[in-house]
C-alpha cells in the first residue's frame, strides 16, 4: 500500500513552494504520495509561519488535534517545519513531546535522513540550521499539476525591519545561480506550465551567480529577461518585492518584457515617514510613490497590491491619516493588512505601545473597507472589457464551467462545452467580462485564436 504524507501550510507563497518540495523529496526517497486527509497519512507535517502571533499559536492548536491520531496509529510521524520551527527549535518537542521532527526552511531536503534517524533512535530529530542554499542541490525535479507554478529564486532576508522575524528564521539573503533557476523553469515549461511566479522574501534583491561558482552576477532584471526567453512560458509574476530594491533596470524591464504581467505586489507597510523610519524600512513615502509613478508611465494599467501594518507602536491619528491618503492616491487593488503583532526578539517588540486595541481595530476596519471599495470599483470597471486569462481548470463553484486568472490576478469563471475543457486548460484565451462579483468575475469565451478555436471543436 502506498504511504501518504499530509502537509498543512501556513503563511506565504514561499511556504507553499517549500511544501511542494517536501512532497517531492519524500516521494523521491520513500515513494510517499500527498493526501488531503490527515487520517490517511503516515507522516503529518506542519509548514509554519511566525510572522504573526496568532499563526504561531494555531500551529500548537493543530498539533493538539493530531495527537489523537498518533495515539491511535503509533507509527505515525509528526513534523513541524518552517519559520516557527526555526524560531522555537527543540522547545516545540518540549511543549509537544509527540512531535518527531523539527526542521527549518533551509533543511527540508534532509527530511528523509531525519525520518530514518527518528525510526532508528526513537528520539525526536531537530535540525534548524542555515546551510546556505544547499537544499536546492538536493531537491528532485519539480512535479507540477496545472499551468501555473512557483519558483524560489532566493532565500532569506537581509533587511532586518524592526518588526520582522524573517531574517532570524530564514537567514540572510542568498540567491540561487541563474542557470539553476532557468533549468527549473525550463523543466516546468516542459510539463505544461505557462505562468511562473518567481519567489523570494525580497525577490528583487536577487543577485545570482551566472553559474555555480561563477564570479559574474545576474541581477533580477536579467533573470526576468532570461525567463521570458524560455519556450512555453507566457506569463511572469514575482513576489514579494521591496521598494528599496526597485532599480531603474527593473522598471525598464516592464517596457522590454511583455510577458511580465501588469500586476505588482509592492509592500509599503505604512504611509507615514515617521512610522516607516521606526520600522527601519529604508525608504520614504515619496520614494515609494516615485517607483509607482515611473512604472505607471510605462504601464498605465498597472494593478497594485500591498501589505500594511496598522497600530505600529507610536502610531498617531495623523500617521494613520497619512496611510489612508496613500491608499486613496495609489488606488490599491488588494492589501494584506493586519494589526501590528509584536514578535519576540525583534527591536520593535521593546517599543512602548499605548494605543488601545479598540482604536487599532477601528483603524484596520476603516483601511480594509476602503480597500474593498477600491477592489469593487476596479472589478466593475472591467465589465464589458476583453481580458486575456490563463485557464487553470474547472470552476470551484461549478465544475461544468472553467476558471482562469487575469493579469491583475482576478478569478474569471466562464461557461465552456465539457468536451473542450481538456484542451482549454493551460491555454491563454480571451474572455469578455460580463459581471463583477465581490471575489470573482464572470465572462464569456471569445474565439480569437486558433488554439482556442480548435479547443471548442
From Swiss-Prot:
Residue stretches making up the TRAM domain: 380-447
Subunit structure, as described in the record: Monomer.
Keywords: 4Fe-4S, Cytoplasm, Iron, Iron-sulfur, Metal-binding, S-adenosyl-L-methionine, Transferase, tRNA processing
Coiled coil region boundaries: none
Organism: Burkholderia ambifaria (strain MC40-6)
Function: Catalyzes the methylthiolation of N6-(dimethylallyl)adenosine (i(6)A), leading to the formation of 2-methylthio-N6-(dimethylallyl)adenosine (ms(2)i(6)A) at position 37 in tRNAs that read codons beginning with uridine.
Cofactor requirements of the protein: [4Fe-4S] cluster
Subcellular location: Cytoplasm
Cofactor note text: Binds 2 [4Fe-4S] clusters. One cluster is coordinated with 3 cysteines and an exchangeable S-adenosyl-L-methionine.
Name recorded for this polypeptide: tRNA-2-methylthio-N(6)-dimethylallyladenosine synthase
Binding site for [4Fe-4S] cluster 1: 12, 49, 83
PANTHER family given in the database record: CDK5 REGULATORY SUBUNIT-ASSOCIATED PROTEIN 1 (PTHR43020), MITOCHONDRIAL TRNA METHYLTHIOTRANSFERASE CDK5RAP1 (PTHR43020:SF2)
Claim: 4Fe-4S is one of the keywords in the record: yes
Residues annotated for [4Fe-4S] cluster 2 binding in this entry: 157, 161, 164
Domain Radical SAM core: 143-377
This protein's record includes keyword Transmembrane helix: no
Catalytic activity: N(6)-dimethylallyladenosine(37) in tRNA + (sulfur carrier)-SH + AH2 + 2 S-adenosyl-L-methionine = 2-methylsulfanyl-N(6)-dimethylallyladenosine(37) in tRNA + (sulfur carrier)-H + 5'-deoxyadenosine + L-methionine + A + S-adenosyl-L-homocysteine + 2 H(+)
Chief location bin: cytoplasm
InterPro entries registered for this protein in UniProt: Elp3/MiaA/NifB-like_rSAM, Methylthiotransferase, Methylthiotransferase_CS, Methylthiotransferase_N, Methylthiotransferase_N_sf, MiaB_methiolase, rSAM, rSAM_horseshoe
Classification via Pfam families: Radical_SAM (PF04055), TRAM (PF01938), UPF0004 (PF00919)
Any GO molecular function: 4 iron, 4 sulfur cluster binding
Domain MTTase N-terminal: 3-120
Amino acid at each position: 500500500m502506498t504511504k501518504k504524507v499530509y502537509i498543512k501550510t501556513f503563511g506565504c507563497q514561499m511556504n507553499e513552494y517549500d511544501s511542494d518540495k517536501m512532497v517531492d523529496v519524500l516521494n523521491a526517497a520513500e515513494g510517499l504520495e500527498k493526501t488531503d486527509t490527515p487520517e490517511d497519512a503516515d507522516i503529518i507535517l506542519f509548514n509554519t509561519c511566525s510572522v504573526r502571533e496568532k499563526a504561531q499559536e494555531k500551529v500548537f492548536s493543530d498539533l493538539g488535534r493530531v495527537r489523537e491520531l498518533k495515539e491511535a496509529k503509533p507509527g505515525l510521524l509528526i513534523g513541524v517545519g518552517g519559520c516557527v520551527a526555526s524560531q522555537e527549535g527543540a522547545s516545540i518537542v518540549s511543549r509537544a513531546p509527540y512531535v518527531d521532527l523539527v526542521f527549518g526552511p533551509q533543511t527540508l531536503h534532509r527530511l528523509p535522513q531525519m525520518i530514518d534517524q527518528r525510526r532508528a533512535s526513537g528520539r525526536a530529530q531537530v535540525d534548524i540550521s542555515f546551510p546556505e542554499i544547499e537544499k536546492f542541490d538536493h531537491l528532485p525535479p519539480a512535479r507540477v499539476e496545472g499551468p501555473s507554478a512557483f519558483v524560489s529564486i532566493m532565500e532569506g532576508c537581509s533587511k532586518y525591519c524592526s518588526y520582522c522575524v524573517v531574517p532570524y528564521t530564514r537567514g540572510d539573503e542568498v540567491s540561487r545561480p541563474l542557470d539553476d533557476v532557468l533549468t527549473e523553469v525550463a523543466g516546468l515549461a516542459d510539463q505544461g506550465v505557462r505562468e511562473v511566479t518567481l519567489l523570494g522574501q525580497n525577490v528583487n534583491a536577487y543577485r545570482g551567480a551566472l553559474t555555480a561558482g561563477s564570479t559574474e552576477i545576474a541581477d533580477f532584471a536579467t533573470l526576468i529577461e532570461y525567463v521570458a526567453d524560455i519556450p512555453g512560458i507566457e506569463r511572469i509574476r514575482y513576489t514579494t518585492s521591496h521598494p528599496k530594491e526597485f532599480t531603474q533596470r527593473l522598471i525598464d524591464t516592464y517596457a522590454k518584457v511583455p510577458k511580465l504581467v501588469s500586476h505588482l505586489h509592492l509592500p509599503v507597510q505604512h504611509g507615514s515617514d515617521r512610522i516607516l523610519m521606526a520600522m527601519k524600512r529604508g525608504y520614504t513615502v515619496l520614494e515609494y510613490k516615485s517607483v509607482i509613478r515611473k512604472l505607471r508611465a510605462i504601464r498605465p494599467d498597472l494593478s497594485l497590491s500591498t501589505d500594511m501594518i496598522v497600530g505600529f507602536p507610536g502610531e498617531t491619528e495623523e500617521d494613520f491619516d497619512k496611510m489612508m491618503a496613500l491608499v486613496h492616491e495609489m488606488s490599491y487593488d488588494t492589501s494584506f493588512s493586519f494589526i501590528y503583532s509584536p514578535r519576540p526578539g525583534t527591536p520593535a517588540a521593546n517599543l512602548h505601545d499605548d494605543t488601545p486595541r479598540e482604536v487599532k481595530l477601528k483603524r484596520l476596519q476603516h483601511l480594509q473597507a476602503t480597500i474593498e471599495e477600491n477592489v469593487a470599483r476596479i472589478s466593475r470597471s472591467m465589465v464589458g472589457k476583453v481580458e486575456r486569462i490563463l485557464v487553470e481548470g474547472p470552476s470551484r463553484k461549478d465544475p461544468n464551467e472553467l476558471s482562469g486568472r487575469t493579469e491583475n490576478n482576478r478569478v474569471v469563471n466562464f461557461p465552456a462545452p465539457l468536451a473542450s475543457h481538456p484542451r482549454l486548460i493551460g491555454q491563454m484565451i480571451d474572455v469578455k467580462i460580463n459581471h463583477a462579483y465581490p471575489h470573482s468575475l464572470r465572462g464569456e469565451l471569445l474565439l480569437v485564436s486558433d488554439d482556442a478555436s480548435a479547443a471548442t471543436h
